[in-house]
Design a protein with these regions (language model features):
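Conserved ABC ATPase signature
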Residues: 132-142
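Conserved ABC ATPase "signature" region
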Residues: 68, 113-128
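Conserved ABC transporter NBD signature motif
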Residues: 60-68
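A short, proline-enriched helix->beta-strand linker immediately N-terminal to the Walker B motif
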Residues: 151-155
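ABC ATPase NBD coupling module
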Residues: 69-86
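Helix-to-loop junction immediately C-terminal to a conserved catalytic motif
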Residues: 52
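Catalytic Walker B motif of ABC-type/P-loop ATPase nucleotide-binding domains
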Residues: 157-160
């Protein structure tokens, strides 16, 4: 479903020219859970942004569902994301003027409200669905962000530190739900995490080492 071939990515910062990836190749399957680990600043979030078409690269190709991202326009990449992707981040980006339920409904386009209710319940936040984001805790916002990402049943789910703001109990609830979701819905879930135990629960773990992707 996602194919990376001979990818190189770099950027300039206050320290000079920094290489993030150099001649990297990897094939993600059509389904299953993939975790991405690495030291701080190694490129976990950059990799997520690259495969979802949110960031550019110098050399190589990334194909998503047989579409070459490097030749797609900004509008075409956006359309691809809307059709196939769901996103959940450590920092939630919920619409503050909408309730938790309405945030999910907006992402779902009002197609399947039953799926929204089911997801909120499994994530343990059905009791806050009518509250505004400003009225709930950081951990609840993070789970709401995941619920919103899943509300349209995406083929590809991209998650950046999905359990970063959660206590151990709620972290396990989210982990169990996501891994079961990947199995029962034949979806591809790719998540970056610094939680070693959570990373090891994935079907495959990718470690970013010295500008390369190494499957453990």
């Amino acid at each position: 479903m996602i194919s990376i071939k001979n990818l190189s990515k770099s950027y300039d910062d206050h320290s000079g020219h920094q290489k993030v990836f150099e001649n990297v190749s990897y094939e993600f399957g059509d389904k299953g859970a993939y975790s991405i680990v690495g030291s701080s600043g190694s490129g976990q979030t950059t990799l997520l942004n690259l495969i979802s078409g949110l960031d550019s690269f110098e050399n190589g190709t990334i194909e998503v569902i047989n579409q070459n991202l490097s030749i797609l326009s900004v509008e075409e990449r956006s359309a691809l994301r809307k059709k196939y992707f769901g996103f959940g981040y450590q920092f939630h980006y919920l619409l503050e003027n909408l309730s938790i339920y309405e945030n999910c409904l907006a992402a779902n386009f009002g197609i399947d409200t039953g799926n929204i209710d089911k997801t909120l319940k499994k994530l343990g936040i059905e009791n806050i669905k009518n509250k505004l984001p400003s009225k709930v805790s950081g951990g609840e916002k993070q789970r709401a962000s995941i619920a919103r990402a899943l509300s349209k049943k995406p083929s590809i789910l991209i998650l950046d530190e999905p359990t970063g703001n959660l206590d151990q109990e709620n972290s396990l609830v989210v982990q169990d739900f996501l891994l079961e979701y990947a199995k029962t819905n034949n979806s591809l879930i790719i998540y970056a995490t610094h939680d070693v135990a959570f990373a090891k629960r994935a079907d495959k773990t990718l470690n970013i080492i010295e500008r390369n992707i190494v499957q453990e």
